[in-house]
Amino acid sequence: MEILSLAADEVNISNLASLQGKDIVIISLQPWYYNIGSNCKDIATRLAEHNRVLYVNKPINRKTWVSKDKDEGIQLHYDIIKNNGNKIETVRKNMWQLFPESVIESINWLPSTSVFKKINFANNKRLAQDIKNAIKELGFEDIILFNDNDIYNGFYLKELLSPSLYIYYCRDYLRGYDYWKKHCDVLEPELIQKADVVVTNSEFYASYCSQYNVDSYYIGQGCNTKIFDGNIEYDMPEDMRNISYPVLGYTGALDADRLDENIIAAIATKYITANIVLVGPELANFENTFLRKFGNVHFLGRKALKELPAYINAFDVCINPQIKNEITKGNYPLKIDEYLAMGKPVVATRTEAMRMFEPYTYLSDSPSAFVSLIEKALAERSDTLNNERKAFAGSHTWEKCLNELSRVINKHLSE
């Protein structure tokens, strides 16, 4: 399938500012209230520079509502509903977040997808009503609906909200996860097909989506080089001061569906003089990892986004030891851009999505090769290579990404 990407002269648009005065509603799997960076947050923030944006947090499901073990973000949302607090909160100029007050039913366990769809329609109606109430209060009209990979909560919102444009943003292969695949194998192709426009952050996903919708566009990916700036000095993080050279570092969620524990174990075993530092929250599927038995593997936990550059700066080599599966095959590895923006040598698993990074990274096809490439990366370090990496990452800007998104939106609104 041909991957669509609009040329600047295809529509009369030259920059992001050309998308102005629109009312945009965004739904996402990533709630705004979590202090975690995401593509959708970056897109929302930039859209709000010239448009009004309502960022809709995920509705709380029944199972979570009755649970006594709520995390801080969910507890905040729960308390707002329970205490009849303000459901709309100003994030910044032209941007608000919505805490939906409706509780939706927990239905992923249902074996029948047809039954799931019927109850999911009722769930979507509840969410749609919350959104309608919010856009009425804010005075939004003729909305554009941007769905950030939320297949279930956004499945019927095109019909229920009648937006001027329904955009589906595909940036993750959810069908590869056990939780999602039961109903996602049916629902995502249907959602892609009925979306007015599909945009993706990788060429692989654009090709995948174009099977179901010819209006599928690769819009690129941005990297926040204002945060990940390899040209400034950083203090050594306190919890890394006693970790000796060479430090091989990873930042991001520790997820057994994405990370290959065997690669990390091979590095720890074969390169015993090295220290492997893992910075990020542990998902439930990683909590009992056998990697804890290695004395040279360090788990430093979740860090705020603004803290990550100091950790990356302290790494001698950055690693992305992904497991090869349907989830990682086409997933754009944003962390690679962040590593390169800091000028760091990078060793990563070779995947389809990593092909574009090959001239600036060391790509491994096996655990044993990973160790050899780390040693090569350490030996070849130079200011020249560091600057080439920074320049390459710097070419992946959110401005370019949002310009492309703006072109797509304006093209389809004018049809």
PLM-predicted stretches and their roles:
Residues 155, 195-218:
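A short, active-site helix/loop in glycosyltransferases that binds the activated sugar's phosphate group
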Residues 382-411:
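A charged, aromatic-enriched C-terminal amphipathic alpha-helix characteristic of glycosyltransferases
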Residues 204, 219-225, 231:
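Carbohydrate-associated surface elements
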Residues 43, 126-136, 181-198:
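Membrane-proximal helix-turn-helix segments that form the acceptor-binding/catalytic region
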Residues 240-258, 268:
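Conserved donor-binding/catalytic core segment of Leloir-type glycosyltransferases
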Residues 34-38, 306-311, 318-340, 348-359:
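Nucleotide-sugar-dependent
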Residues 286-310:
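Nucleotide-activated donor-binding/catalytic signature segment of Leloir-type glycosyltransferases, i.e.
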